From Swiss-Prot:
NCBIfam families cross-referenced by the UniProt entry: S15_bact
Name listed for the protein in its UniProt record: Small ribosomal subunit protein uS15
Free-text function comment from the UniProt entry: One of the primary rRNA binding proteins, it binds directly to 16S rRNA where it helps nucleate assembly of the platform of the 30S subunit by binding and bridging several RNA helices of the 16S rRNA.
Species annotation: Geotalea daltonii (strain DSM 22248 / JCM 15807 / FRC-32)
GO molecular function: rRNA binding; structural constituent of ribosome
PROSITE patterns: RIBOSOMAL_S15
Family as reported in the entry's similarity comment: Belongs to the universal ribosomal protein uS15 family.
This protein's UniProt keywords: Ribonucleoprotein, Ribosomal protein, RNA-binding, rRNA-binding
C-alpha cells in the first residue's frame, strides 16, 4: 500500500492547481506508483496470485484513465506518459 507521505509527494508533483487531488494526471501517477510497488512485490512473492489479480485491476483502471485523457486532451496525455515513462 502507498504511504500517506508518498501519496502527498506524488499529488504535489502532478497536481494542476493547489487543491487538485482528483485530476486524471494525479490518479494515473498514484496508480502507476502502486503498479510499480506490486511489480517489485511479485519479484519475491511469485505465488501471490490474489494480489496479482488486484494488479490487473489497477492496470485496467489506469488504462481507462489514460484513454479518457487521450480522448479529452492529447497534449496532457502525451505529457503524463512522458513524465511517468509509461510505454504506449
Amino acid at each position: 500500500m502507498l504511504a500517506t507521505d508518498k501519496k502527498q509527494e506524488i499529488i504535489g508533483a502532478y497536481k494542476l492547481h493547489d487543491s487538485d487531488t482528483g485530476s486524471p494526471e494525479v490518479q494515473i501517477a498514484i496508480l502507476t506508483e502502486r503498479i510499480t510497488y506490486l511489480t517489485e512485490h511479485f519479484k519475491t512473492h511469485k505465488k501471490d496470485h490474489h494480489s496479482r489479480r488486484g494488479l490487473l485491476k489497477i492496470v485496467g483502471q489506469r488504462r481507462g484513465l489514460l484513454d479518457y485523457l487521450k480522448k479529452k486532451d492529447v497534449e496532457r496525455y502525451r505529457s503524463i506518459i512522458e513524465k511517468l515513462g509509461i510505454r504506449r
